[in-house]
Amino acid sequence: MQTSFHKFFLSMILAYSCCSLSGGGYAAEIMIPQGIYDGETLTVSFPYTVIGDPSGTTVFSAGELTLKNLDNSIAALPLSCFGNLLGSFTVLGRGHSLTFENIRTSTNGAALSDSANSGLFTIEGFKELSFSNCNSLLAVLPAATTNNGSQTPTTTSTPSNGTIYSKTDLLLLNNEKFSFYSNLVSGDGGAIDAKSLTVQGISKLCVFQENTAQADGGACQVVTSFSAMANEAPIAFIANVAGVRGGGIAAVQDGQQGVSSSTSTEDPVVSFSRNTAVEFDGNVARVGGGIYSYGNVAFLNNGKTLFLNNVASPVYIAAEQPTNGQASNTSDNYGDGGAIFCKNGAQAAGSNNSGSVSFDGEGVVFFSSNVAAGKGGAIYAKKLSVANCGPVQFLGNIANDGGAIYLGESGELSLSADYGDIIFDGNLKRTAKENAADVNGVTVSSQAISMGSGGKITTLRAKAGHQILFNDPIEMANGNNQPAQSSEPLKINDGEGYTGDIVFANGNSTLYQNVTIEQGRIVLREKAKLSVNSLSQTGGSLYMEAGSTLDFVTPQPPQQPPAANQLITLSNLHLSLSSLLANNAVTNPPTNPPAQDSHPAIIGSTTAGSVTISGPIFFEDLDDTAYDRYDWLGSNQKIDVLKLQLGTQPSANAPSDLTLGNEMPKYGYQGSWKLAWDPNTANNGPYTLKATWTKTGYNPGPERVASLVPNSLWGSILDIRSAHSAIQASVDGRSYCRGLWVSGVSNFFYHDRDALGQGYRYISGGYSLGANSYFGSSMFGLAFTEVFGRSKDYVVCRSNHHACIGSVYLSTKQALCGSYLFGDAFIRASYGFGNQHMKTSYTFAEESDVRWDNNCLVGEIGVGLPIVITPSKLYLNELRPFVQAEFSYADHESFTEEGDQARAFRSGHLMNLSVPVGVKFDRCSSTHPNKYSFMGAYICDAYRTISGTQTTLLSHQETWTTDAFHLARHGVIVRGSMYASLTSNIEVYGHGRYEYRDTSRGYGLSAGSKVRF
C-alpha cells in the first residue's frame, strides 16, 4: 500500500509540472487514492503534501480514505497532511469518506490547510468527513538575539491554529456527515480556523464535540463571518473549550495571529439560518461560553435553537497561557456571556447594529442552565431582538448580573411573542440583599434582564393567546444617561393583533421609560412591583393581583425633585378577586378584627408623581373559583382592594368615586358589591378602596349540578325499552307452539347539550333470553335481560351501570271485549333494578365517585287491526294499523358522596306516559322460509312528571334541585326486522330501531335465535 501511495504523490508532482509548463491558466485536477494509511505500520515517513497553483487546484477522491497515527510535530518543517499555498483549493468527495485520526503536527491545520491569500477553500460532496484527536501543537522556531555584539541562538514558541486552517473563505458544502471530535490546538480554532466559514447542505450529521483551543474558538474561529444555513442535520457544538473567547465559536477581528488577509472594516458576524436544529451544550470559555462575536449574532428560521449548560468563567485556563497577541482589554469582559457574548465592536460608518443578537422566525428557542461569572448568564449584548418565533424560554441561567440577559449601556431590547410565549423563569443573579436565597454559599435573587444606563425597551408585545412572562424581573441601571422623558414612549402591544399579556410575576421590575398600554394587558402578579416613569392607557387594561405594586421610578439623583410629567393615568383597571380574598384572610363568618393585615393592590408613591383613575374598575375571576368559595363569599364581607398613594398631589384632590364595571357571574354565590374610598389624609396619606359584598343566593356551576343523577332514570327506562324490542322481535316471525329464544341487545342514545352545557350520552349492551308458549290464539312468555352500560354528561361526570330486568308478556289474536275494530292485542310489563357508579372529575378538586341504585317499572299495552293483502299487491302479506300506550316509572334512592366536595342527593322519580300510533307491514316469502317486518309510528308523550333531585353541597350548606332533561313531547320511531328459518325448528333474526325527537336521537340493534318445539 505504501508503494501505491508514493506513486500517487509522484504523479501529483508530474501533474503540477505539466500544468506549470503549459501555462494555459487551467485549474489542476488531482485524484487522491483510497485505502487506510496508518503511521504505526508505514515503513517510511508519510509524504506530507503541499500544492499550489495560481489558477486553482481541484482534488477529488477515488474512494474511501483514512489517515491515522501520523506525527511530524518535531520535524524541522512541520506540515499539514494536505496543504495549499496558491489559488483556490477544492476538495471533492464524490460520495466517498475521508477520515483523519490521531494526527499531530506543530503548524496550522493538522489535517488540511490553505495558506493562499486569495480564492476559496471548498470541501464538498463527501459521504463522511471525520476529524478526531488531531493536535496542532506549539511551533518552536529559531530566533537570534544580540548580546555585546555577538549572536546567541534562541527559540520562540508560536501557537498553531485549526485542525482545518484557511486564510481564505472556507466552504463546507453538501456533505452527508461532518464531525470533529477531541481535537486540540495551541492557538485558535480547535476544529476550524478560517477567514470565514460557511456550513451548508449537511444532511445527516454535523457535530463539533470536545474540541479545545488554548486561545479563541474552542470549535471554530473566524475573522469575518460564520454562517450555517440550510442544514438538515442538527448543528451541534458540544463540550468544546476555549482558553479565552468563544467556547464554541469565536468571530474576532484579531484572529489568525493578527495577520488575516481580511480587509473588511466591519465587525465579524455569526449567523444560523434555515437549519433543522442548532445546539450549543456544555461549551466553556473565559468569555462567551458558546459564542463570542465582535459583531452581530443572528438566528433566522431555524427549527430549534438550544443553548444548555454553557459557561463563561474567567479562571478556566491560567492567565500566562498564550493568547495569540490579542488586545489586553479582552480581560475586561472575562466571565461575561454564559451562552453568547456579542461585543459592541467598532461599527462601520453609518451602521448602528453592532452588538446585536436577534432571533427571527425560530421554531423553538431555549436557553437553560447557562452560567456567567460576570454578566449575562445566557446573553451579553448591546441589543437583543426576538420576533416571529415559537416558544422562547430562558430558564435557570445564572450570572453575577443579568441572570438571563445583560444589555450594555444605551442598549435596546425588543420582544415580540408572535407564535409562542416568551418566558423568563428561575434565572438568578448574585446579590448582597438580606434574607436572599442561598445557593452553595452565594446569596442570589431572581433576575431576567439587566440593562445598563441609557438602555430602553423598544418593543414589548404579544399576539392574542400568547404572553411574555417575567417570573424574574427586569432591571434598568440607575444613572443620568437615561432616555429623555419626552422621547417616544414604550407602547405595550403596539400593532394589529397584539392583544396578549405582558406579565410581571415576581420581584421589582424597573423601567426608566414612559409606558403606554395600546391593547392587551399588563399583568402584575401577586407581590410583583413595576416601577415606571409614567404610565397611561389608550386601550387594553392593567390587571393587578393582591399585594402587587405599580410605582414611579426613583428620581436620579434621589435628591432631585420628581418630574412634573410623572403620571399614572388609568381608565381600565382590573383586580384579581381571588387573590384579594385570599390575601385579606377572608373567613366565614368574618372575624373582627381581621385575622391578618390586608394586602390590597397598590398604585402610586408617597414621594413622587400623581395618579388618576377613571371609569369603572373590574373584579376578575379568571379561574371561576372565587364566587364558589364558601369561606370567601358565603357571607357578607368587607375587604380592602386598592391602596392609592397620591404622592405629590395635594390631599384635597381626593380620587373620584369608582363603580364596578363587570356583571355578576352566572354561577356560584350571587350578590352585589359596593365600592367606597376610605381616606387617610394625615401627611398626605393613602386612600384605600374598600369593597362591601352582600350575599343574595347561590347558583351551582355546571361541574356541581350532576345532571347525570336524574338523567340516569331515563337510562333505566331505555334499558327496558330495548328489552321490550327484543321481546317483540321474538314474538314476530313464523308461528309455533312453544319455544326458547336468546338475543343480544344494544342501545345508543344522545341528547343535545342544554344552556348549562349538560348533555347526555347513553350506551348499553347486553342480552335477553326468554320462553314463549302458545295457548290457542294467545301467546304467553317470560324473559330476563341483563344490561351493562355507560353514560356521561359532557361536563365532568361519567357513569357505569349494571341492570337486571324481568319481563312478562301476553299477546292474542282475538278481539278484545267483543270489539270488531281491533283483531289482536298485547300487554307487556317489566321491572328493572340497576346500580349506578358515577365519577366526577372536577377541574378544581380531586375526583369523587359514588354509587346508588335505580328502580324502574314499565307497562305496555297495544291493539291492532291486521289487514290481509293479496300477495301480488305491494309485495306485502299484511298491513296492521295499531295504537299503543306505554307507562314508565323510575326512581333512585337517596345517597351521599364523600370528600371535600361531597354532595348529598335526595331521592327522585320520573313518570312518563307515551302513546305511539302507527302502522306495521309484514311480508312472508312464498319460496323461502323468510319473513320481513317494518313499522313506523308517531309518538306523543301525553303525560310526564319529573320530581328532580334535591342536591346539597355539604361544604357550602347550599341546596338546589337538578331536573332530568325533558324529552321532546313528539317524535317518530321506525323499526325493522328480518327472520330466516334455518331448519323447521331453528329461526334466526335481526332487529333494528331508530327514534327521533327534537334535541335527541336513539337507536338500537339486536340479533337473536329461536328454537321451536
From Swiss-Prot:
Keywords: Cell outer membrane, Cell wall, Membrane, Secreted, Signal, Transmembrane, Transmembrane beta strand. It comes from the Bacteria. It is a peripheral membrane protein. Residues 733-1013 form the Autotransporter domain. It holds the Pfam family ChlamPMP_M. It is found in: Secreted, Cell wall; Cell outer membrane. The keyword Lipid biosynthesis does not apply. Belongs to the PMP outer membrane protein family. This is Probable outer membrane protein PmpG. The gene is pmpG.
